C-alpha cells in the first residue's frame, strides 16, 4: 500500500549500515516508462547527447560501490529497463554505454511497488490466514508485471500492511522527539501528552493515503 513507510524504511537501513543516507541511490521508475529510458540507466551510446555524463544508475554505483539502490514503483518501469535490471540481478554487474563494467556486488537493491494496494483493508488482518492472504495477493500482483526469472532473483518479498491509528501515534511521537532538540536550542521546552498524540494521530489518520 502507499504511504506506509517503504521509502523511509530504506533510509533507516542506509543510516544503520553507513551512518548516513548519502549512500542511498534513489530512482523513481515513473521516469523510466519509455523504451529510450534504458539509456538513462546505463548511459547514452557514443554520438548521442549525454554520452559523457554516464548513466544515472551506473555512474552513481561506479563512484559509490557500497550503496543502497532504491527503485521506487518498479511496476512503472518499461520492460526494456526491467531487462537491464534483470541482468544486474543475475550477474551482479553491467557494462555501461562507455564500455566500463560496473559492479553491483556491494550494493543492496530494494524495489518498492504498490502492487496489491487495491486489496481491501478488511482482508488484511494480523491472523496467519490474513497475512498469508495478503502475501499471496501481493505476489500475484507482482507476477502480473514481473517475469518469473526476475522474481526468482529477488531474495525476499516483504508485504506491508496499511498503517493503523496506533502506528500513526508512534510516528507522531518519533517526529516530535526529532523536533525537540531544535526547539531547545531556541529556549523552548516541549512536551506532548498521550492525549495530544492521540488527537494528532486521529487528525492525520488515513486508510488509503498513509
Protein language model features and the residues they cover:
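AAA+ P-loop NTPase nucleotide-binding core of proteostasis motors
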Residues: 1-210
Amino acid at each position: 500500500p502507499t504511504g506506509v513507510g517503504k521509502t523511509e524504511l530504506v533510509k533507516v537501513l542506509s543510516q544503520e549500515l553507513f551512518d548516513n543516507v548519502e549512500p542511498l541511490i534513489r530512482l523513481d521508475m515513473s521516469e523510466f516508462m519509455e523504451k529510450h529510458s534504458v539509456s538513462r540507466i546505463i548511459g547514452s551510446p557514443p554520438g548521442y547527447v549525454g554520452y559523457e555524463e554516464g548513466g544515472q544508475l551506473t555512474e552513481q554505483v561506479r563512484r559509490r560501490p557500497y550503496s543502497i539502490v532504491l527503485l521506487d514503483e518498479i511496476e512503472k518501469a518499461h520492460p526494456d529497463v526491467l531487462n537491464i535490471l534483470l541482468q544486474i540481478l543475475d550477474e551482479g554487474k553491467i557494462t555501461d554505454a562507455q564500455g566500463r563494467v560496473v559492479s553491483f556486488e556491494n550494493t543492496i537493491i530494494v524495489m518498492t511497488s504498490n502492487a496489491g494496494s487495491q486489496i481491501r483493508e478488511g482482508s488484511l488482518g494480523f491472523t496467519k490466514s490474513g497475512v498469508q492472504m495478503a502475501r499471496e495477493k501481493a505476489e500475484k500482483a507482482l507476477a502480473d508485471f514481473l517475469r518469473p526469472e526476475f522474481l526468482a532473483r529477488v531474495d525476499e518479498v516483504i508485504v506491508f500492511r496499511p498503517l493503523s491509528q496506533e502506528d500513526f501515534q508512534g510516528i507522531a511521537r518519533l517526529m516530535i522527539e526529532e523536533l525537540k532538540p531544535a526547539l531547545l536550542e531556541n529556549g523552548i521546552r516541549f512536551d506532548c501528552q498521550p492525549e495530544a498524540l492521540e488527537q494528532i494521530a486521529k487528525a492525520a489518520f488515513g486508510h488509503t493515503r498513509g
